[in-house]
Design a protein with these regions (language model features):
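Cytosolic regulatory modules rich in charged/polar residues
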Residues: 1-129
Length: 129
């Protein structure tokens, strides 16, 4: 889980170009969108949705692009969380504490790493033998 203080998100009121800047700068493909506070998540924005919309032109706002957020509790077991990701066809969830406050964010990659170990990205493939 990514703790709250390390969660990268944007406010619903920012301009789309600002969202793109954050996605590029931080290297994320999905980030939460909030209404003034991480405790008020409006949804999640996917880089591919933003890029496709920018490429096709036209006027749009961040709210036009957000997808519903998946919320989960910090006490959920790994197997349950994986099932939730599959059922909701998503790869990111907002983790809430007992009082409904956002305590962090978890991705399907986090879950898979708990099961199979660290996943290293951009590792060149080596021939066997």
């Amino acid at each position: 889980m990514i703790p709250r203080e390390h969660v990268v998100g944007v406010d619903l009121e920012v301009r789309p170009d600002e969202v793109l800047d954050v996605l590029i700068e931080k290297g994320h493909s999905r980030i939460p969108v909030s209404r003034g506070s991480l405790d008020r998540i409006a949804g999640v924005i996917y880089a591919r949705d933003l890029l496709a919309t920018v490429r096709h032109g036209g006027l749009f706002t961040v709210s036009d692009l957000i997808r519903p957020a998946m919320f989960t509790s910090g006490s959920k077991r790994i197997a349950e969380l994986l099932s939730e990701f599959q059922r909701n066809n998503t790869q990111i969830a907002i983790v809430q504490g007992a009082e409904g406050r956002t305590i962090g964010l978890v991705t399907i990659e986090d879950v898979l790493e708990e099961i199979v170990g660290e996943i290293h990205e951009d590792v060149p493939l080596r021939p066997a033998g």
